[in-house]
Amino acid sequence: MVDDERVVSPETADDHEDSVEKSLRPQVLAQYIGQEPIKHELSVYIQAAKQREESLDHVLLYGPPGLGKTTLAMVIANEMGVQIRTTSGPAIEKPGDLVALLNELQPGDILFIDEIHRLPKIVEEMLYSAMEDFYIDIVVGQGPTAHPVHFPLPPFTLIGATTRAGLLSAPLRDRFGIVEHMAYYETTDLQEIVLRSADIFHTAIATEGAHEIALRSRGTPRIANRLLKRIRDFAEVAPDHDQIDLAIVDHALDLLRVDSAGLDATDIKLLETMIDYYNGGPVGLNTLAANIGEETETVAAMYEPYLLQRGYLKRTARGRVVTATGYQHLGRTMPDNN
């Protein structure tokens, strides 16, 4: 969950936002906007599996949060015409939890595990035989009466999603036959997503308004939809506005403190702290986090990725450094020693 004040967070804010996301989800690949190479590959794999009347190979989806990994898993289930059971790595605390999930699956069904990198080791190891040979062995009883019991499983598809693919063990990663990296979205795709969501919300929006929202959405559909939802409120109370136009978008996002590149107040504070107190860097992540009053993990997971992707920051062996692009965006002069 994310701080409600951070409108550009890629994480889900609360249960209400999660329910809104569900209402906006596409149901089939043809409705899914963006990620074209992945869609093309998956359409081939799905069609082939259906022709052979087999379950789809196991799928690993990895990439930054908010890009639609869960949505894509739902779409795959719809395209395959099977049921999907959803859970998360932290929710499967012990082998018995996994057994209960697997026991509910029918042939061809999908088990979706979000944050799969957070599975306990003992649960992960049980998955190996389930994924590879469709069986699990569990020990029943205790002490001298303990004995293994062999449980065959119906053929199923495991879809794992993670924002931290590097934390997956090699044995688990190697058991996924289909591995797809989800990248940040292009502005044109985000604009199309905003227009589609506005239509679902029954909200009139000008093309230039949708384009501006897309520009400030950090390449992330979840952020685009959240900004649209907030801006819709401004449009509905604004006099003499029958649609979300560019003026309303600019006004709303200025009040929300989201700048032209999608940076918010904390992003700006991070860059300005590095410039004002550390001459632009290099500065260590722990030091930087302490200076802006955030946890180190929060800075690494929530703030740094987008700043790196936009080229405002770079990593060096000695720490983080503000780039010339970062200085330029802030309207600051880069010192000669940088």
UniProtKB/Swiss-Prot annotation:
Keyword set, alphabetical order: ATP-binding, Cytoplasm, DNA damage, DNA recombination, DNA repair, DNA-binding, Hydrolase, Nucleotide-binding
InterPro entries per UniProt: AAA+_ATPase, AAA_lid_4, DNA_helicase_Holl-junc_RuvB, P-loop_NTPase, RuvB-like_N, RuvB_C, WH-like_DNA-bd_sf, WH_DNA-bd_sf
Catalytic activity: ATP + H2O = ADP + phosphate + H(+)
Subcellular location: Cytoplasm
EC number: 3.6.4.-
Similarity field: Belongs to the RuvB family.
Name of the protein in question: Holliday junction branch migration complex subunit RuvB
Origin species: Levilactobacillus brevis (strain ATCC 367 / BCRC 12310 / CIP 105137 / JCM 1170 / LMG 11437 / NCIMB 947 / NCTC 947) (Lactobacillus brevis)
Encoding gene per record: ruvB
